[in-house]
Design a protein with these regions (language model features):
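A structural signal for short hydrophobic beta-strand segments in well-ordered beta-sheet cores
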Residues: 29, 146-148, 218
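Left-handed beta-helix
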Residues: 188-337
Length: 337
């Protein structure tokens, strides 16, 4: 692999399924296990060979760049990031095509609300033209699947298949050895107007590549996490805390707080007369007093008092008092019962 590796992350979606949280921030900046979804998306690439030069291509919506750019400058200043604005939501292929001037040579593409665990340490020795990461599921009809022949090569991708015998669901993580060939396939996709509900899906461009003779294999993953809806964010938060992303030992040293691991409590948060856990993430600058909370995520600078909380997502700078048992509050909300 002689070229700089580009990593494209389309994130321009409106995040309507994550409202009210996405009224004020892009979906990738939703809090999750002490960090943000975007931080964990970037962590997927930690196993890349250190010899590779990496540049990121972020395709964002018209009102998202400022917050995402500020987050990257503060938390990932060492990363080279190019931004592209997708003014109209016309799908994955359209998003990638916006970055075409930067796309020569190898490309990784990952969705901004999906997390997987995979080893990328040998990516600089890949002989195939492409890779699609997959996971077997019981019912693949809601997803896209990769059809593989007896020799292990991908023959084509199928969106929302009716035949459930093929259950290798594509998890939204791809590698292309020559991204310029993908751009050419996307151009043909545009010319043929291959759309689904007025969106250009990447699967159609991949099928064009395969029809042209590209050789693609699959890689299976055991962990595939979603952060696209509130229930999935809480489930992903549980998984991450269960697998070492918390700080339960440090949190247990706080006075006046009962900790039920696993949890993450930012060192700057003030927690008094509280029972925290299991599966709770509390961000920087938060204040929790007289609170019992479990299976919840609380973003930065929020104040919670006198609450019994479970299965809740709390945004930034939220003030809530009372006895409510389940909340989903976006940023800058005030609630008193």
């Amino acid at each position: 692999m002689g070229n700089t590796l580009k990593i494209a992350v389309p994130m321009a979606g409106l995040g309507s399924r994550m409202r009210p949280h996405t009224w004020s921030k892009p979906k990738p900046l939703i809090a999750l296990a002490g960090r943000t979804v975007l931080d964990y998306v970037l962590a997927q690439f930690d196993s890349l060979p250190k010899s590779l030069q990496v540049e990121y291509l972020f395709i964002v919506g018209p009102n998202q760049r400022e917050q995402v750019e500020a987050h990257m400058s503060q938390h990932h200043p060492e990363k080279v990031v190019h931004f592209f604005i997708q003014e109209v939501m016309r799908g994955q292929s359209d998003a990638l095509y916006l970055a075409r001037e930067h796309l020569r040579g190898p490309l990784l593409m990952a969705f901004s609300d999906t997390l997987i665990e995979t080893d990328l340490s040998n990516l600089d020795h890949i002989e195939e033209d492409g890779l699609a990461w997959v996971r077997p599921v019981e019912d693949p009809r809601r997803f896209g699947v990769a059809v593989v022949n007896e020799a292990g090569w991908v023959t084509h991708l199928v969106e929302k298949p009716q035949d459930v015998s093929n259950n290798l669901v594509v998890v939204g993580f791809y590698y292309f050895k020559r991204s310029e060939e993908l751009m050419s396939a996307i151009e043909e996709q545009f010319q043929r107007n291959l759309t689904l509900k007025n969106e250009y899906f990447l699967a159609d461009a991949v099928n064009i590549l395969l029809q042209r003779g590209a050789r693609m294999r699959t890689r299976q993953v055991n962990v595939w996490l979603d952060a696209g809806i509130p229930a999935a964010v809480l489930e992903t938060n549980r998984h991450l805390l269960d697998h070492g992303c918390g700080n339960s030992i440090e949190a247990a040293q706080r006075e006046g707080v009962a900790i039920i691991p696993p949890v993450y409590i930012d060192p700057s948060a003030r927690v008094q007369r509280a029972v925290v856990g299991p599966h709770v993430s509390i961000g920087a600058g938060c204040v929790l007093e007289d609170v019992i909370i479990r299976n919840s995520v609380v973003d930065t600078d929020s104040q919670l008092r006198g609450l019994l909380l479970s299965d809740s997502l709390i945004g930034r700078q939220v003030t809530a008092e009372g006895k409510t048992s389940q909340l989903s509050l976006g940023d800058n909300t005030w609630l008193k019962e």
